[in-house]
UniProtKB/Swiss-Prot annotation:
The active site is at E174, E366. The keyword Hydrolase applies. GO terms for molecular function: 6-phospho-beta-glucosidase activity. This is 6-phospho-beta-glucosidase. It comes from the Bacteria. Coiled coil: none annotated. Gene3D superfamilies: Glycosidases (3.20.20.80). InterPro entries: Glyco_hydro_1, Glyco_hydro_1_AS, Glyco_hydro_1_N_CS, Glycoside_hydrolase_SF. Keywords: Glycosidase, Hydrolase. It holds the Pfam family Glyco_hydro_1. Transmembrane segments: none annotated. It comes from Clostridium longisporum. GO terms for cellular component: cytosol. NCBIfam families: PRK09593.1, PRK09852.1.
Length: 473
């Protein structure tokens, strides 16, 4: 028995971005350097001493100077929400400054005003892999407890400044990714190969306390704020029915969901005691940490690109391609050009798993297909991209989202990743495109930065206009 594809009337359709991947203007109007400005090869690549010309993020797609043009295109698609991040080092250039950079604050005022003009709700990530470089070099990032105070000053500043312009906030992007990418996720300067589990989990404790503190401060400044956490969402399948594979699935799942457990329940889960004991980890708590952690989030948000397989067989374990947590390849799934396995039903699964676990509203804030796009001229002489592959990917995933809603999941909204082409976080390429809008910029630095609507632009516009009824089963 089938049902009509149905989404709530208040469903927040939109798109998602990150400051470091699309703003550009990395050193304009008082902005300081972030950890991204010396990472030209992506999340897992080597860093450089200073910003280099091959770092595509320094210019990005120049949203900083073209935000009006881009927001107009988002409005044409009918966006109800637009996810963006505030570049921390645009507000506090060194991270530990006492006084914020007014020009940085003014820029986001203008962006939020422009969104408001079109009736688009901003969804703002406070920290999206953008730790100020000074905090990384001088303090070793979140490994140092001092960052809680610097983050508190930053969030208090932006919450106060934008309290009447922004309702929806996310504290950290994919906070659980710090396990695998401590530099990008937590700004930890110590090389990953030399970083102890003690220091890694202590850093994550600092982030969790800071996140809960942001929830507390935000609700004090404006009780109407809706503040969520954001995790890298990846459902885990056992590779085989062997009990050892199921135990490994449980371990991998807990490693990932530990962060959401703390955000949603306000305390550490008991299962972490064993991990800490077996790895000689002793978290240093301050006397008020437990009370601060009790400030739970209003909703759980997550990214979804792929599922994963877990196995206890060491010979089968290998670093699969993917967004940090790929695990073992699933023999039943096809993969994208970048090796990311495509699993629409996995999205339905994780929606149900997260809602069953937390019974809090959920928000899909990243989902999409990175692919090589070819710009062509259509019969009317307009430049476009015939990205039927992207349409199919998104359609198939959204059908499964509708299934999850029918299952009983409370879902606030859906924002596709990279709604306009931007620089990839994982590989730092522009060749890997996600958007409904093609940006004429290439990995050799060439291009006009002109914007062109892809075929998927009008497809998504119709999906939003019909509140999902135009989707095909």
């Amino acid at each position: 028995m089938s049902f009509d594809l149905s989404f709530p009337k208040s469903f927040l359709w939109g798109g998602a971005t990150a400051a470091n991947q699309f703003e550009g203007a990395y050193n304009e109007d008082g902005k300081g350097l972030s950890i991204q400005d010396i990472a030209p090869k992506g999340v897992m690549g080597p860093i450089t001493e200073v910003p280099t010309e091959d770092n595509m993020k320094l210019i990005g797609i120049d949203f900083y100077h073209r935000y009006k043009e881009d927001i107009k295109l988002f409005a044409e698609m009918g966006f109800k929400t637009f996810r963006l991040s505030i570049a921390w080092s645009r507000i506090f250039p060194n991270g530990d400054d006492e006084i914020p950079n007014e020009k940085g604050l003014e820029f986001y005022d203008k962006v939020f005003d422009e969104l408001q003009r079109y009736g688009i709700e901003p969804l703002v990530t406070l920290s999206h892999y953008e730790t100020p470089l000074n905090l990384s070099k001088k303090y070793n990032g979140w490994a140092n407890r001092d960052l809680i105070g610097f983050y508190e000053r930053y969030v208090r500043t932006v919450f106060t400044r934008y309290k009447d312009k922004v309702k929806y906030w996310l504290t950290f992007n994919e906070i659980n990714s710090a396990i695998h990418a401590p530099y990008m996720s937590a700004g930890i300067w110590t090389d990953k190969s030399e970083l102890s589990k003690q220091d890694l989990y202590q850093a994550m404790h600092h982030e969790l306390v800071a996140s809960a503190l942001a929830v507390k401060i935000g609700h004090e400044i404006n009780p109407d704020f809706k503040i969520g956490c954001m995790i890298l969402g990846i459902p885990v399948y056992p590779l085989t029915p062997h009990p050892d594979d199921l135990i490994e699935k449980m371990r991998v799942e807990r490693e990932s969901l530990f962060f959401a457990d703390v955000h949603a329940r306000g305390k550490y889960p008991r299962y972490m005691n064993r991990l800490f004991k077996e790895n000689n980890i002793e978290i240093k708590w301050h006397e008020d940490d437990a009370e601060i952690l009790s400030n739970v989030v209003d909703f759980i948000s997550f990214s979804y690109y792929m599922s994963s397989c877990a196995t206890a067989d060491e010979e089968k374990k290998k670093a699969g391609a993917g967004n940090l947590l790929a695990g073992v390849p699933n023999p039943y799934l096809k993969a994208s050009e970048w090796g990311w396995q495509i699993d629409p039903k996995g999205l339905r699964l994780i929606l149900n798993e997260l809602y069953d676990r937390y019974e809090k509203p959920l928000f899909i804030v990243e989902n999409g297909l990175g692919a090589v796009d070819e710009l062509v001229t259509d019969e009317n002489g307009n430049k476009t991209v015939n990205d039927d592959y992207r349409i199919k990917y998104l359609n198939d995933h959204l059908v499964q989202v509708a299934e999850a809603i029918e299952d009983g999941v409370e879902l606030m909204g859906y924002t596709t990743w990279g709604c306009i082409d931007l620089v990839s976080a994982s590989t730092a390429e522009l060749k890997k495109r996600y958007g409904f809008i093609y940006v004429d910029r290439h990995d050799d630095g060439s291009g006009t930065l002109e914007r062109y609507k892809k075929k998927s632009f009008n497809w998504y516009k119709e999906v939003i206009a019909t509140n999902g009824k135009s989707l095909e089963r």
